[in-house]
Amino acid sequence: MSKSFYGYIRDAWKNPDETYVRDLRWERLQVWRKEGSVTRVERPTRIDRARSLGYKAKQGIVVARVKVRRGSMRKSRYIRGRRTQHTGKNKITVGKSIQRISEERAARKYPNMEVLNSYWVGEDGKQKWYEVILVDPSHPVIKSDKNLNWICGKAHSGRVFRGKTSAGRKGRGMQTRGTGTEKTRPSVRSNLNRSKK
């Protein structure tokens, strides 16, 4: 059976350092570094990945490329006339993944849209880039799309801020079932509060 066009793109992105993606990325990152934190793009960089996550080239769907710093939290050293014994600064990390942070930043940039999903497109020593797929739930084209109109319901309002996207569910431990996950459902916080009642 012959491989499709998307199949060749998918194979190239599996090992981006060994294929033609390496040269493309070298050129793209020079342009992306000069852009802002959230930039709307005309079409997805990885069309195969975008389509597998629900992207369609139609009205009401937007793709935004988000630039986020790599590493820990970048906490600043405060000067308040004293020295605390346990100044948390260097090894403090955020409880969210960088991909989840990028989704939330895109959602704040476009408050009338909901985040459908996101995927990695590049990184260097300082930053990571993700492309976020956003959907307008009030657009008539989206409302009439049987594959996407579920996002128009009130239950999916602000879904990215409640950890309902794929990256959010992964960070909450929802991808795993069985032994060792007894305290993850419905959430770590609500499971902790069960003993206080």
From Swiss-Prot:
Top-level taxon in the UniProt lineage: Archaea
Gene of this entry: rpl15e
Pfam families the UniProt entry points to: Ribosomal_L15e
Disordered: annotated segments: 163-197
Lineage: Archaea, Methanobacteriati, Methanobacteriota, Stenosarchaea group, Methanomicrobia
SUPFAM superfamilies in the record: Ribosomal proteins S24e, L23 and L15e
Any one GO BP annotation for this protein: cytoplasmic translation
Compositional bias (Polar residues): 186-197
CC terms in the record's Gene Ontology section: cytosolic large ribosomal subunit
Family of the protein in this entry: Belongs to the eukaryotic ribosomal protein eL15 family.
Biased composition annotated in UniProt, kind: Basic residues: 163-172
PANTHER family, alphabetized: LARGE RIBOSOMAL SUBUNIT PROTEIN EL15, RIBOSOMAL PROTEIN L15
Protein name, entry field: Large ribosomal subunit protein eL15
NCBIfam families membership: PRK04243.1
GO molecular function terms attached to this record: RNA binding; structural constituent of ribosome
Keyword Transcription regulation in annotation: no
The UniProt record lists the keyword Nucleotide-binding: no
Organism of this sequence: Methanococcoides burtonii (strain DSM 6242 / NBRC 107633 / OCM 468 / ACE-M)
Keywords: Ribonucleoprotein, Ribosomal protein
InterPro entries: Rbsml_eL15_core_dom_sf, Ribosomal_eL15, Ribosomal_eL15_arc, Ribosomal_uL23/eL15/eS24_sf
